[in-house]
């Protein structure tokens, strides 16, 4: 079969590999749709110290069950499923409390298991054991269902923020994740949602797709002055950094109201050190939260919101590419007007 494989030394190669076969407790799916995540983009551009090669990457996935191994799974061939990629051990302190995404022995599809940028993928037995395999209603299009995991990650990021009608929300980053955070903030009843970026094309597209938000191009406008005027000099109550720029963490401290809640959602380079103002946190009584991945329960909630139409997430998909043209998709994502791309089965390639 065709697969996109991380071979080490910052190299990803489209190559033919053996089709996986089911083992005890596992299942094989034919990938119907996989989505390119920011993590995949970083691996494409810079490699990854987390991935032990060779490894098929890609972790946002839905597919059709082809084969089921012996021992435990109730799935049947022909069923549609999505797979939650972050798989806990089920036994550690955090797993026992439902926080499987911060498991002490977390293993992730596309990093520790072969992932979704392939024609077929094996679902690990531990994914079944942890409830990470979710049956899909055939009425939900795969192109929407595959976005469940990133929506669940945003739900996790906002789970500690308690956004409500009295809150102004500032989001750094107008990429796909920033736009999804904005959708959730609007749905939570925030009185105003401000999306800031330095990419004018992305901001324009975000504004076209969500008329309930405000946008600020901070390369041309004074974001501090905008926030001051918008909040009567009080500052914003909720800030989400949905971009890999550590300086936004420092700016968040400056633009926050007293007792604001801040989610550091996007990972940053340089080991993430040296961006926080400890005195600002102390004197303004700021609550600063991290966010990593999502649990199976959060994925089920995300899928419910997609299925019900509460969150219109598929509108942020700019298009799709067949697997045999996946590198074109990665290059296309450099365009400011491209927010999210899907990878579909290859054209004219026999399994």
PLM regions: where:
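C-terminal hydrophobic helical "lid"/dimerization subdomain
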Residues: 1, 221, 250-254, 296-351
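Short N-terminal strand-loop motif that marks the start
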Residues: 1-62, 123, 127, 217, ...
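Glycine-rich beta-strand-centered segment in the early N-terminal region that forms part
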Residues: 18-34, 47-96, 101, 134-137
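NAD(P)H dinucleotide-binding glycine-rich loop of Rossmann-like/cofactor-binding domains
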Residues: 91-172
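Glycine-rich phosphate-binding loop and adjacent beta-alpha segment
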Residues: 190, 245-308, 345-351
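Short amphipathic alpha-helix with an adjacent loop that forms part of the alpha/beta core around
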Residues: 222-232
């Amino acid at each position: 079969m065709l697969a996109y494989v991380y071979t080490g030394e910052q190299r990803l190669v489209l190559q033919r590999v053996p089709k996986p076969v089911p083992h005890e407790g596992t299942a094989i799916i034919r990938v119907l749709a996989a989505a390119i995540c920011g993590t995949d983009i970083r691996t494409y551009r810079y490699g990854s110290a987390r991935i032990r090669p060779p490894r098929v990457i890609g972790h946002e996935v839905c597919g059709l069950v082809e084969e089921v191994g012996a021992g435990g799974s109730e799935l049947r061939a022909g069923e549609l499923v999505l797979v939650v990629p972050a798989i806990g051990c089920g036994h550690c302190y955090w797993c026992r409390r439902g926080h499987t995404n911060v498991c002490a022995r977390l293993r992730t599809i596309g990093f520790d298991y072969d992932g979704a940028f392939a024609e077929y993928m094996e679902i690990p037995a531990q994914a079944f054991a942890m409830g990470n395999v979710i049956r899909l209603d055939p009425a939900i299009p795969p192109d929407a269902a595959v976005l469940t995991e990133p929506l669940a990650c945003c739900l996790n990021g906002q789970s500690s923020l308690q956004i409500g009608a009295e809150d102004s929300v500032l989001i750094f980053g107008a990429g796909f994740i920033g736009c999804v955070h904005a959708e959730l903030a609007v749905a939570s009843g925030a009185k105003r949602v401000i999306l800031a970026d330095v990419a004018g094309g992305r901001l324009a597209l975000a504004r076209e797709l969500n008329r309930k938000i405000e946008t600020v191009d901070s390369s041309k406008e004074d974001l501090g002055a905008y926030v001051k005027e918008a909040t009567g000099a009080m500052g914003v109550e909720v800030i989400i950094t949905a971009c890999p720029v550590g300086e936004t963490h420092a700016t968040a401290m400056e633009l926050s109201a007293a007792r604001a809640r801040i989610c550091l959602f996007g990972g940053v380079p340089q080991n993430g050190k040296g961006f926080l103002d400890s005195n600002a946190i102390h004197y303004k009584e700021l609550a600063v939260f991290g966010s990593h991945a999502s649990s199976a329960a959060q994925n089920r909630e995300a899928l419910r919101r997609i299925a019900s139409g509460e969150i219109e997430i598929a509108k942020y998909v700019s298009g799709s590419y067949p697997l045999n043209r996946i590198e074109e998709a990665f290059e296309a994502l450099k365009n400011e007007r491209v927010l999210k791309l899907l990878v579909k089965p290859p054209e004219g390639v026999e399994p």
